[in-house]
Amino acid sequence: MAEEENVVYVGSKPVMNYVLACITQFNEGANEVRIKARGRAISRAVDVAEIVRNRFMPEVEVKDIKIGTEELETEEGDTVNVSTIEIVLEKPV
């Protein structure tokens, strides 16, 4: 799987780890950073986007938000629906 550029995958680590990752991407010259999460990490992804915008980089705007559902297969062979979110933050040039 090719690694996407300027994407921060939110999981179970502390929120500030992901905030720092976003700020680092912007400081390295990225005009756009995508924050992706699924399941219980969705609320943490929203927190990351809001902290970046409100506390650290007020010039950054939310460009797009995409929500969806992924079907995952369990070890027993059942399928489970998992919600996903992608938040695109943009730094005006």
From Swiss-Prot:
Domain of life: Archaea
Function (record text): Binds double-stranded DNA tightly but without sequence specificity. Involved in DNA compaction.
Localization in the cell: Cytoplasm; Chromosome
Similarity comment: Belongs to the histone-like Alba family.
Gene assigned in the entry: albA1
GO molecular function, a single term: RNA binding
Name of the protein this chain belongs to: DNA/RNA-binding protein Alba 1
Gene Ontology BP terms: chromosome condensation
Keywords for this protein: Chromosome, Cytoplasm, DNA condensation, DNA-binding
InterPro entries according to UniProt: Alba-like_dom_sf, DNA/RNA-bd_Alba, DNA/RNA-bd_Alba-like
SUPFAM superfamilies with a match to the protein in the record: AlbA-like
A GO cellular component entry from the record: chromosome
One family name in Pfam for this protein: Alba
Coarse class of the protein's main subcellular location: cytoplasm
Naturally occurring in which organism (per UniProt): Methanopyrus kandleri (strain AV19 / DSM 6324 / JCM 9639 / NBRC 100938)
